[in-house]
């Protein structure tokens, strides 16, 4: 990972290959961060680095700035106006299409010139207050456009722009350290050895395989680290590929960051009121987790033959973030099928989605992919595939000290007094004597049994030997 940010600087022409090699040598010799080595050697200034790391997307002022054709945008505007019962305003169209007033004004001028719309009412000389209405010709063209695609919404961004931004805000340029991993996992009880493995794995920005028995916290670890990934990324609302539209932004996955200047109906009137191209939303890095419900078609572009546009696949929506495949091996598809789909993306860092026409296109495969499984990895995949997964980490059962600490935290969270003697009683009688492994999820589950019983008896829950005996009797299966 450390070198990847340097590679981006080389690609942008900010430093040379030779300078990168010198910086990497110093970084490996002295430690710290690669960017600090680049700065200390004087290859770039702090201002240049800051501009590089916190780039922005310029606001389009004219149709040509959008990267889309006039015909495409006019059809999109006509469809949006058609759904407004044929009457519309500049402000409303700017809001629906996520385009600045200046671009929509240019589009409206085109539709008026072609007699596709006419001014209905105007309270002043400003175009922003004019109410326009589609002409019969405009309605007919809108209906024809609907036959091509029912998509109405934010104007898409061109594929090339999406691919560039995806590479520019790569998850591999994030520099993570021990302080970050400690902070991200402070809510979990994890041994130092495991922490020392997890830190470099996530910091690499590469694929990770978490394996081990159930209940040991693999999913919680992946989620905690995923949600702790720092940084902001630009997410397109939609993408245009050869005239086809891919709906991309998903509110269930992408969490926008409040931006007062890019918010509200009136924010699109002037360039000075926009911080970036409104077709993009500034969001936290996405974290996507799928489990047994995953099927092979969920990893492909989904074309709706009735609406005639695409929905981006789930892993594509995780771009510049973290994709967690939980319970790997429990899916309805064979693990080998799933892994064959991802051999090239994991190995080469590119993916090749396919349109329903058969056309394929290339996009960067930029995400931290985490496989989590309770099964033996060697029974799921062959060694050749495991070699393509950079980090393989065995998450083992908890130690006695870790188990007790989890018990203490669970009691504290439920406002139940923790008794160390009761904890010793639980371990001695129900784990050590019975040679039962110390599973990290058991304290939470046992406490839930204790609380259920206390609620039934209309008593406050207590962490006592009697409560433990009752909870254990209902929790473990004895044959």
Regions found by a protein language model. Name each.
Residues 84-96:
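Short acidic, hydrophobic short linear motifs in intrinsically disordered regions
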Residues 341, 381-396:
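A short helix-turn-beta junction within AAA+ P-loop NTPase domains corresponding to the substrate/partner-engaging
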